[in-house]
Amino acid sequence: MNRSKFIAICLSACVANSLYAVEKDNNETKLDGVVVSASGFSQQIKEAPASISVISGDELTKDSFTSLHSIAQKVPGVNVVGGEDGPASGISIRGMEKSQTLVLIDGKRVNSSSANPKGGAGDMNSNFIPPAEAIERIEVIRGPMSSLYGSDAVGGVINIITKKDFSKFSGNVGISTTINAHKGIGDGRQGDFYLNLPLYKDLFALQLWGYKKLRDEDNYKGGYQKSDKRNLSAKLWITPDEHNKFFIFGSNEKHDYSRTVGKTATIKTNKVLNAYDYEKKSYGVGYLGEFDNLNADISYIYDQTQRTSLFDSLIPAKAKNHNFNSKFTTFFGAHTLTFGYDFSKQNVGTTFIVSNASKNGLKDPKTYSMSEHAGFIEDEWQILDEKLFLTLGSRLTHNEFFGNHLSPRAYLVYNATDTLSLKGGVATGYKTPDVNQISPEVGTIQGGWRIVDFGNKDLKPEKSTTYEVGAYYDNQADLRGSVTLFRNEFKDKILDTDGSNVNKIPAFGPCPPSAKIPSVGCPGWGTYFNIEGATVWGVELSGDYDILSNLNLSSNYTYNKSKIKTGNPTINTPRGPMKFSETDLARLDGKSLTATPEHTLHATLTYKPVKSVKTFFGANYESKLTSVNFGAGNRVRENTKDLLTFDTGVSWDANKHLTLSLNAYNIFDKVRYDEALADDGNYYWYPQEGRRFWFKVAAKW
């Protein structure tokens, strides 16, 4: 009997046993619906001025949680693009690009992707996060939130809230393994821990957490690379009294990746790119104050992320980030006022960035920096007591390269009845270009030295304006649901000239007559420019029904449609102006902005035969995909295959300290990948996991 059949039999037995168990007290603690990300202070979800979803820490610990990608199925409007952990993976919110999803930990930015200018390790901001055992909940805001959080919050915000109850000794530890039954896909192992240690009365407390994640390499070209990820973090809390808390924080994370020629790498692949690692070090201090009419949250976080490769002298990359954040909330009468000041500075040094004059400078890369100052203010006005809330806010950002930018938003919440709330509003977002995209003296290597993209001093930040209206229903008993309609006008999208006629211009002056342009011997010239943008619109539905006291059905559906609008901008090249219509990039016009399905549906049936046992059965559907490879030739590729998968699992609280979980994902082993089409340049595919079994042992005290 092979291992997959054996595991399947064990899983079926566990589920069957739980279904016939004797029902006992089945009162389950439900999340109280309090969030902080939408406005900067605690409030009920139904009154929050944004479309927001919450995932509890308990959900994370009893499911396979390896990165933020694991939460996508739980939230409408959220999709993983490019596979769970592939080189082009990331989280898209409402059809926007992955780079426009802002990831926060306790309201503070995760700054990692800037050390990954060439990709290869996937979505770093979704991977450099605490383990599930250290997380209290995750809040997901769908729609731009630049008024509170600044640049990058164009598509939405994911805020990871860590545990902060350190009044008594407690801890969690979990060990899990993933066994893939699909041929050629590697297995995974993971260990996590969280410790809360009161040190001296109520004055000092220490929090420790960490993880170790291992994944075997796939055995097919372009599959998942081998990875080894580990983390160790510590936070010391100093609490002189009930109103004041101070913390000192330190964290070290390291992720190693490698590919093997003949497995996921081809013989043609440059060996330099086959082995590389990322190390992130973070340090910070902060203060939290809670008084009668004023709350304060002040922090300074410094982090450094460095990428090294098989040959460090060729392609190192280092990013240093300084972030000072201050936020104050005051309450007076019918108004809740939130205001603050933020400062950030980023230094990036990488030999993927070269001098405009020649190919020299690889051994001694120059460091480039960008800084921003921002002030923000937002007022929630309770016009009618517990009935009508109006939120007005704005953020003024000063960027050293782009000057001042104003990001306003307005949102209205009306509690029509005790069970029905109506919401609607307008929010704006913006994203400044990277340093290497705006300086003509800086070039970024593309296509393995075939193309060098130089900065454009006339580049404008990307901007978005989202309009949404929704209704939320909760009968306070057994039925909850929501519907939201949204439209996002995305302007000034930044595009590069890769895969166009522009690349036939030599990057470093005349080439020998026999040289092919572009090629390694004679790289082609490229640059960045703004196109008109894109329009994204859709509908989000979610429902949650307690069929019985121990039987629940939850589901969400998303319709998402997007169209790129290129316009006909002028590109300034070394040979003079060139209209967009001359570049051979008109193929992008009208295509989807991201590789997100037009239709996405998730449904989960959860049954608790006894208080200690929880079983589930889930179904997931995604329609066909269209992808534009921005920055990688700007190719348009399609995958016309729909995807329908099913999951099931069981978790058992053996006692108050020990929990066992066994899940089967993608039971019928369905993937989009078609090996016969893998080398077709018009065929879109990404690394996927087929049928797999996940087992976890978790202990808490």
Residue ranges of each PLM-predicted region?
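N-terminal periplasmic accessory domains that precede
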Residues: 68-71, 89-92, 103-106, 125-128, ...
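Outer-membrane beta-barrel signature, preferentially recognizing the C-terminal barrel domain
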Residues: 264-290, 368-370, 419, 428-491, ...
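Extracytoplasmic beta-strand/coil segments of soluble accessory domains associated
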Residues: 69, 73-112
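Periplasmic-side early beta-strands and strand-to-turn transitions of outer-membrane beta-barrels
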Residues: 121, 166-278
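Gram-negative outer-membrane beta-barrel transporters
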Residues: 174, 382-390, 487-489, 512-631, ...
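N-terminal Sec signal peptide and the immediately downstream disordered periplasmic leader
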Residues: 1-63, 70-73, 195-198, 238-242, ...
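Short acidic/polar hinge/loop motifs at secondary-structure boundaries
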Residues: 110-142
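Conserved C-terminal beta-signal and adjacent last beta-strands/turns
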Residues: 7-10, 196-200, 237-239, 424, ...
